[in-house]
A protein has these predicted regions:
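Nucleotide-activated sugar donor-binding and catalytic core shared by glycosyltransferases
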Residues: 1-196
């Protein structure tokens, strides 16, 4: 891929949809409070159902080099521009994989857990656990570690992309139902592929 893994200049935060667990705001506050992340741009994406949009808008407006996107159709571009994603499980993992975007992942629903654990096992994502169990300290440590580790980011991105390619090309979903259900969702989103 043409992606450069040298350093993290831009982070994409996209938890998906309404983010009822409040992880988006929590991540923003956490990142903004750390001087070490001051030079890193932040792109934050939420769905139109996101309830605390006023608070989030004010939070992001108060920090230079950060942008808020609500119900955007710019996702492919944002993924291409980012050097690291912090997101939830679910089908967006496959979109991130297609753009060689290394990801820190938090499960925000029970049904996301098996897929996240499986992709972590395969070395395709850095999975931090269920949102209720992920402390601020754990988030900060994981973000700091992955920002400082170019080889880890590249390995995650390349493994995720390779798995995506296998899942798309292999017509026999044998022992990996999680992988294939995810790939099928993305295969149905070919409009996303065409924008890459």
């Amino acid at each position: 891929s043409a992606r450069n893994y040298q350093q993290v200049n831009r982070i994409l935060v996209s938890i998906g949809g309404s983010d009822t667990v409040g992880l988006t705001e929590r991540l923003c506050k956490l990142l903004f409070a750390q001087q070490v992340f001051a030079d890193i741009s932040l792109d934050v994406v939420v769905g139109s159902a996101y309830e605390k949009i006023t608070e989030l808008t004010e939070l992001i407006a108060a920090r230079a080099n950060s942008r808020l996107f609500v119900q955007t159709n710019e996702m492919a571009n944002l993924m291409r521009q980012a050097d690291l994603a912090i997101g939830a499980g679910g089908s967006s993992q496959w979109e991130r994989a297609l753009t060689h975007l290394p990801s820190l992942v938090v499960a925000v629903a029970d049904n996301q857990q098996p897929g996240c654990e499986y992709l972590q096992h395969l070395g395709a994502i850095q999975y931090l656990g269920r949102v209720e169990q992920v402390s601020d300290e754990l988030l900060l440590n994981a973000i700091t570690e992955i920002i400082e580790n170019k080889d880890l980011r590249q390995a995650l991105a390349e493994r995720a992309y390779a798995l995506m390619a296998i899942a798309q090309n292999d017509a026999s979903p044998s022992a990996t139902p999680v992988l294939y259900s995810g790939a099928e969702k993305v295969a149905r989103k070919m409009s996303f592929l065409s924008t890459l």
